[in-house]
Design a protein with these regions (language model features):
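Amphipathic coiled-coil signal-relay and dimerization helices
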Residues: 45-47, 119-124, 213
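Short hydrophobic alpha-helical segments used for membrane anchoring or interfacial signaling
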Residues: 39, 110-117, 206-213
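Juxtamembrane extracytoplasmic/periplasmic/luminal helical "stalk" adjacent to the first N-terminal
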Residues: 1-84, 103-107, 116, 149-150
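Extracytoplasmic/periplasmic ligand-binding sensor regions of membrane-associated signaling proteins
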Residues: 95-198
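Short linear interaction motifs
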Residues: 15, 93-94
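Generic hydrophobic alpha-helical scaffold/packing signal
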Residues: 35, 193-197, 205
């Protein structure tokens, strides 16, 4: 009995390590491809233009963003991609760059970018909100202006209804190095999804060890 228990423990440990290492490799690859996307000049230009479009007044800027956020949420509540504000952000140059990335890396089921204030610039999907700066992932990636890579635990994404991992990375001005916006994606772990769902069961998220993090 002791030998059997010992063998089972060793096999389970090996399986856990293998799964963790495999997941670590997938996440490293994902971060590398997203980092390349953050260097896309056309994408950055769209973000810079939106940042420059605001009045030089923080209160007025927030009022403008809040107004658009209400319009956006109304459109989302009625599943309306034809709303002019939504349609603009699904079809502009930033969105087209994100769609191209998504075609190459289809496990990214939702990709979008915000400006420095957390307002959407372009997106592949109609998100639940226009304003994103109040989200944990946004604040973590912004990191008080220093920037950081954010990786969530596996969770059910409210916009897509699928189990995935959220990644968020800062977008920087090439000339100054300053953060100008945030890139976020929901990444579906297709090769591991069945195993993850079995572990999560009826809950919506789980803790996960990521090697090197």
């Amino acid at each position: 009995t002791n030998n059997l228990r010992g063998n089972l423990e060793r096999e389970l440990t090996a399986l856990t390590v293998t799964r963790a290492n495999r997941l670590g490799d997938l996440l490293d690859t994902q971060i590398n491809t997203l980092t390349t996307l953050t260097l896309n000049n056309s994408l950055l230009l769209g973000i810079i233009e939106q940042n420059q479009s605001y009045k030089n007044n923080a209160a007025a800027t927030q009022i403008e963003i809040d107004t658009k956020d209400k319009i956006w949420q109304t459109a989302d509540s009625t599943n309306n991609n034809s709303d002019p504000l939504v349609r603009e952000h699904l079809t502009n140059s930033a969105a087209l760059n994100l769609f191209e990335y998504q075609k190459t890396f289809p496990d990214n089921i939702e990709v979008f970018v915000t400006d420095i204030h957390g307002a959407l610039v372009g997106t592949t999907n109609r998100t639940s909100d226009y304003y994103q700066a109040d989200e944990t992932w946004w604040q973590a990636a912004y990191n008080n202006g220093q920037g950081a890579v954010y990786i969530s635990d596996p969770q059910l994404d409210e916009s897509t209804g699928k189990l995935g991992i959220q990644f968020a990375l800062p977008l920087r001005n090439h000339s100054t190095g300053k953060i100008i916006g945030i890139l976020r994606t929901t990444y579906i772990l297709t090769p591991l999804n069945a195993a993850l769902q079995a572990e999560i069961g009826e809950t919506s998220e789980t803790d996960m060890f990521i090697p090197g993090e």
